[in-house]
């Protein structure tokens, strides 16, 4: 798993060069992984500071397509995609649909897609109460429409789904695992792993 890079607002003029370096690095990682039968999963992430450059989910898909390496796939983190789409005023469903054809790994956890922005909570429970940030909540606790997403999208063969439910929700993990298994059947995914 590899998160995409970031540029600060004062570095935005370097965007094209940074994207080229990232593609070259992913190609090198793919070449290294190939003899071991391992896939490098390039994960979408969300903006963490004003003016920052992060690739949107659709741009992550374009990067994976440009790299065009059998050992480099996209990783959809649904909550990250939801947060970034909200922050940038993009259509969440269109963004993940752009990633799906090159996706070989999924991270599932729920949220409301509201960016953390400038609010810094004193306790994690505050973010949950207000529904902001990367909450890593059990499936069904946020407002991601899991059923329609998995009914509509097709991923690469042998795609791995991994739950990323936060440790404070450990008692809810069995129910989330049951939901994840049902979702995997909707899309014919090969395996489900719990964290």
Language-model features: locations:
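Histidine-acidic metal/acid-base catalytic patches
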Residues: 28, 57, 61-195
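Active-site acidic/histidine proton-transfer and metal-coordination neighborhood
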Residues: 1-73
């Amino acid at each position: 798993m590899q998160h995409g890079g970031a540029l600060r607002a004062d570095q935005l003029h370097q965007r094209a060069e940074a994207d080229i370096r990232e593609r070259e690095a992913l190609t090198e990682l793919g070449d290294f992984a190939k003899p071991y039968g391992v896939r490098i999963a390039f994960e979408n992430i969300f903006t963490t500071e004003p003016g920052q450059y992060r690739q949107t989910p659709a741009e992550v898909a374009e990067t994976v397509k440009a790299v065009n390496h059998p050992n480099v796939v996209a990783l959809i983190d649904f909550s990250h995609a939801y947060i970034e789409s909200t922050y940038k005023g993009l259509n969440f469903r269109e963004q993940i649909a752009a990633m799906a054809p090159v996706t070989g790994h999924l991270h599932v956890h729920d949220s409301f897609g509201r960016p953390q922005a400038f609010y810094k909570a004193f306790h994690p429970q505050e973010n949950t109460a207000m529904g902001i940030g990367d909450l890593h909540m059990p499936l069904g606790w946020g407002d991601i429409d899991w059923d329609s997403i998995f009914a509509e999208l097709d991923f690469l063969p042998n795609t791995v789904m991994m739950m990323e439910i936060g440790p404070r929700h450990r008692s809810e993990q069995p129910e989330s695992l049951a939901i994840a298994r049902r979702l995997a059947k909707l899309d014919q995914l090969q395996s489900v792993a719990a964290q």
